[in-house]
């Protein structure tokens, strides 16, 4: 029984990576008064609204149902039995969107870092595995979340390139330089 509880605890930690990253971005935005980090934070919030209708529409379909035995599947992994649709994994969408946007921005700023690519891949893979093992999502829902995250991350990156505000661009370089240190 202890082994099972430890396993569940570890799976919940890996499953919560998107929440930790969102809090990290919010902390950067507040502590450093950083407009780019605030932009990234709001894209994470906006993602929730984008996924609301697909989850609602497909909730009772075979594609949208959570696997049997799903438990603690909400944003904070503390929600008991889930009653929301599972199609398009929000956790996977969030972290894939964030890393896609950051990696594209770093590439354009000529500070691409393979370690960030490896770290992002590790976080995405471990989150996907934990969402699958906790029975919160099927493999299809996880992969669909990743594809949705890539599309939203690319869209976020394109929106960033349209913003010509000097402060935003300086703040963007500050955030990207944090990841350069890794």
Regions found by a protein language model. Give the residues of each.
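Multi-pass membrane proteins that catalyze or facilitate reactions on polyprenyl-/lipid-phosphate substrates
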Residues: 2, 45, 113-116, 120, ...
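Alpha-helical transmembrane segments that form the membrane-embedded catalytic/substrate-binding core
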Residues: 91-95, 131, 136-161
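A cytosolic-side transmembrane-helix exit/cap motif
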Residues: 57-66, 138-142, 161-171
């Amino acid at each position: 029984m202890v082994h099972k509880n430890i396993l569940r605890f570890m799976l919940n930690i890996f499953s919560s990576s998107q929440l930790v990253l969102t809090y990290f971005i919010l902390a950067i935005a507040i502590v450093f008064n950083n407009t780019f980090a605030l932009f990234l934070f709001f894209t994470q919030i906006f993602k929730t609204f984008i996924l609301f209708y697909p989850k609602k529409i497909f909730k009772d379909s075979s594609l949208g149902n959570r696997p049997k035995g799903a438990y603690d599947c909400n944003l904070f992994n503390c929600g008991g039995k889930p009653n929301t649709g599972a199609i398009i994994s929000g956790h996977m969408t969030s972290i894939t969107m964030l890393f896609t946007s950051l990696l594209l921005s770093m590439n354009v700023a000529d500070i691409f870092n393979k370690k960030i690519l490896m770290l992002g891949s590790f976080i995405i893979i471990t989150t996907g595995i934990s969402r699958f093992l906790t029975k919160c999502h099927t493999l299809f829902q996880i992969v669909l979340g990743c594809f949705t995250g890539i599309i939203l991350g690319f869209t976020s990156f394109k929106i960033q390139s349209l913003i010509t505000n000097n402060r935003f661009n300086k703040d963007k370089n500050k955030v990207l330089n944090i990841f350069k240190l890794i």
